[in-house]
């Protein structure tokens, strides 16, 4: 398949990420005592070696929200897709980037 410029189209499942690799994911939610712990437990289901040393926390300026950056060891696109689905489906999570 080619596009209008006669260059090959990128296959839809082709990834720009080389696996395995460290991959940052930003997760935001309401400021709650167990938010970070809950996210750590969820991420560990997909990356068993994940620990709090691979996470940064930033409260919002108003103190109502907490932003987390988790660095996961990505082993496949399927793993990342499943992790994103689990994070976005969690009731404590407002945004995943």
UniProtKB/Swiss-Prot annotation:
SUPFAM superfamilies for the chain: YbeD/HP0495-like
InterPro entries: UPF0250_YbeD-like, YbeD-like_sf
Cysteine-cysteine disulfides: none
Highest taxon above the source species: Bacteria
Pfam families the UniProt entry points to: DUF493
PANTHER family recorded: UPF0250 PROTEIN YBED
Similarity-based family: Belongs to the UPF0250 family.
Name of the molecule in the record: UPF0250 protein RSc0326
Organism, as annotated: Ralstonia nicotianae (strain ATCC BAA-1114 / GMI1000) (Ralstonia solanacearum)
